[in-house]
Amino acid sequence: MLHMTQAKKPLMLIILDGWGYREAREGNAILAARTPNLDHLIEEYPWCFLEASGEAVGLPEGQMGNSEVGHLNIGAGRIVYQDLTRINFSIRKGDFFKNPAFLGAISNAKANDSSLHLMGLVSYGGVHSYMAHIHALIKLAQQEGVKKVYIHAFLDGRDVPPKAALKDIEELDAFCKENGNAKIATISGRYYAMDRDKRWDRTKLAYDALTMGVAPYKTPDAETAVSEAYKRGETDEFVKPTVITDSEGKPEAVIKDNDSIIFFNFRPDRARQLTWAFVNKDFENFPREKHPKVYYVCMAQYDETLDLPIAFPPEELENVLGEVLSKQGLAQLRIAETEKYAHVTFFLNGGQEKCYEGEDRCLIPSPKIATYDLKPEMSAYEVTEEVIGRIRSGKYDVIVLNFANMDMVGHTGIFEAAVKAVEAVDSCVGKIATVLKEVGGVAIITADHGNAEQMENPTTEEPHTAHTSNPVKCIYFGNDEVKGLKNGKLCDLAPTLLELLKIRKPEEMTGESLIIK
């Protein structure tokens, strides 16, 4: 006799990256877009607001949320105190200045009479790095008597306004002059130095500037480098690598054998490629004309496979959502396009690379284009087609999906493109909801942080390319088992999903279910 396996009715967590809530209509791509599907879901089903920024997600008060932080909190089911908060606290306590990873880099530079290079995103954004950390490193180098200290400044323009760098670089230059002898040696937009999508031609441009002093442009000082980039029509993110020269027209500094590097970005995803280029012996992604042997320190753990000193190693999170589902023997799927794949896997699993038993992963490639305003739908339709097939397969108990569009297109600052991105996601959510209803599944639809709801700076009327600190909506879609949801935080999502699955939440999860009893 043939026994048929009963098809599962999946519980979905659909994360609409960058889908924030803001009442004002000006510069609000979410309100400007036609969103019949999301509008219908909000009218017909229970929903609430979730805090997705500041202390609610383990960041300093008022600090905007981001995708890494959002997914960590969602998966952990508790407030996860972020690296930004941990590092700020260590500076206040004084532990920062005794950190063995930093002191190792400094000892190496002093022992070899070599240079200490401080490399990373010069920004107040607080997403990848923070200006106070750079200041603390400069003070530490001065305190320890390092003679040759050079800064390789990557410019932001995404998590802060597109032309914030000139003021920030002027301020950093002044700080260097007042606190020792550090000098800015190179400038590069994050588009080049911090690529994460294996566009190695971009990484190579930054690497060559750092190791050979070879770059598209050279200027006598950092402020001129930024000013001239603005004249060329480049905003901070896209400033081409520029080498700062000394009085003889030679590069102020290049990274050489026996030098020390401290990469002060604390977020891993955009620090990996450049790190690999420096430290991987078998690196084949582009030819390295110079490969200096350096003492390399990472601010946080960029890659589990690299044996490098880490200033702030990860704190282990136990009993995160994926682990709890796995222990219950449930089949789970994580699906996203390239831009957010790490978020639904690595970050949702508490910052761990490992895949849990019963966890499948599906990566849909993001389109290979210069900027996503050129294709606001990105790969959302392909993600949708794939996930619909997976829903109909009846294989999965839980599916976690991320749509990247509202965030990635929001970062371009181009309003019309962001509107199209919102509409593409709305269309995809509608298709998924239809299929879920057919198979008897349910969904929680929410976001990890805001972005597309504010595409314009209301004061300056310039494009707003950063995340926001606005709340996000959370919708329950499915049967009438849930009568209402109460307002909460991102860390309340995992306990809510576990309640829907009738699984007791582990004691490590301090978040509360959003379901109104």
Swiss-Prot record:
Its EC number is 5.4.2.12. This is 2,3-bisphosphoglycerate-independent phosphoglycerate mutase 1. GO terms for cellular component: cytoplasm. Gene3D superfamilies: Alkaline Phosphatase, subunit A, BPG-independent phosphoglycerate mutase, domain B. InterPro entries: Alkaline_phosphatase_core_sf, BPG-indep_PGM_N, Metalloenzyme, PGAM_B_sf, Pgm_bpd_ind. Keywords: Glycolysis, Isomerase, Manganese, Metal-binding. Its cofactor is Mn(2+). Mn(2+) 2 binds at D17, S67, D448, H449. It is an enzyme of class 5 (isomerase). Substrate binds at H128, R158, D159, R190, R196, R267, P268, D269, R270, K340. One of its GO terms (biological process) is glycolytic process. It comes from Methanosarcina barkeri (strain Fusaro / DSM 804). It holds the Pfam family Metalloenzyme. Disulfide bonds: none annotated. Belongs to the BPG-independent phosphoglycerate mutase family. Binds 2 manganese ions per subunit. Catalyzes the interconversion of 2-phosphoglycerate and 3-phosphoglycerate.
